[in-house]
């Protein structure tokens, strides 16, 4: 299993993501700089981490979505390679058109940083297969622009297609229909604002995020 973490100027969760991937696979991921035009040969899994890429200038994720490496990420996603975007990575995926919708300023206009309860809406995807349908899990969030928005038709479509992966249970940021994570139509791209990589060790508060990586990386015990 070869994994890769995309690193942008301003990424600050890339090392956390690398630790999560290495914990599950036993191998350190390739850390791929945003200026690269290709991924390491044989890359099986791609992660776009949290942070403040390019200082969140213009819009969160807008400049990163136009980085050279994103073309290779999009091509890999089109071939079915799993792609996980967390927090700023989710913002990048929406800006790049790999996921529907947009992430706006939190409804309360405050940075939210705490562990929140989520409901698993779709337990059939490659990312969520280790969870039960309707299961409640606890995952940390840390964001200012996590308010998910899409027009009503798009929301109805992704709901009807089972593409809402996770939903907030306590109205964290004003997201439409409390959506916390969204899948692409093929199910191999997941964007989510909560940070599963920060929930892989009991010493750090819980392991509810670990199962996402175990399922996605195909090594679930």
UniProtKB/Swiss-Prot annotation:
Domain of life: Bacteria
Annotated protein name in UniProt: Phosphoribosylformylglycinamidine synthase subunit PurQ
Pfam families per UniProt: GATase_5
Record-listed E.C. numbers: 6.3.5.3, 3.5.1.2
Pathway: Purine metabolism; IMP biosynthesis via de novo pathway; 5-amino-1-(5-phospho-D-ribosyl)imidazole from N(2)-formyl-N(1)-(5-phospho-D-ribosyl)glycinamide: step 1/2
Organism: Sphingopyxis alaskensis (strain DSM 13593 / LMG 18877 / RB2256)
Gene behind the chain: purQ
Localization per Swiss-Prot or TrEMBL: Cytoplasm
Ranges of residues in domain Glutamine amidotransferase type-1: 3-221
Keyword list, A-Z: ATP-binding, Cytoplasm, Glutamine amidotransferase, Hydrolase, Ligase, Nucleotide-binding, Purine biosynthesis
Function: Part of the phosphoribosylformylglycinamidine synthase complex involved in the purines biosynthetic pathway. Catalyzes the ATP-dependent conversion of formylglycinamide ribonucleotide (FGAR) and glutamine to yield formylglycinamidine ribonucleotide (FGAM) and glutamate. The FGAM synthase complex is composed of three subunits. PurQ produces an ammonia molecule by converting glutamine to glutamate. PurL transfers the ammonia molecule to FGAR to form FGAM in an ATP-dependent manner.
Membrane spanning stretches: none
